[in-house]
Amino acid sequence: MISAYYAKDPSQKRWRDDPAIKEYFAWAKQYYVGDPEDGIATYGYQVAQALEYVLRKCGDNLSRENVMKVVTSMKDVEFPLLYPGVKVNTSATDYHPSRQFVMIRFDGKEWVPFTELLTGD
């Protein structure tokens, strides 16, 4: 079984010493009552990091116009839980945050990357 993925998976041993994963687990221990290895929880945490980025860039101007300006002008933004090298890029005509990923294969125990970082449309 193969798939494509763009983020670090906190359930996998290879990421246990990663500073971003350690920070995520510390946050989860304090604020999250569910399973911190759950992919939905990790995804929510990543979305919250993106929202924090946007709000910081907006500063005191939280108008819809300014929020949309920031959201649609992200250039090479890296978030801690994204797979190394994955960058977020958006524009006024392309809201899709990233087209970068690695191919992963299930080895019977966990998903293992088997390609370098790829870019696709």
Where are these regions (language model features)?
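Generic alpha-helical secondary structure signal
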Residues: 18-22, 65, 112
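Segments of small-molecule ligand-sensing domains
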Residues: 30-42, 52-111
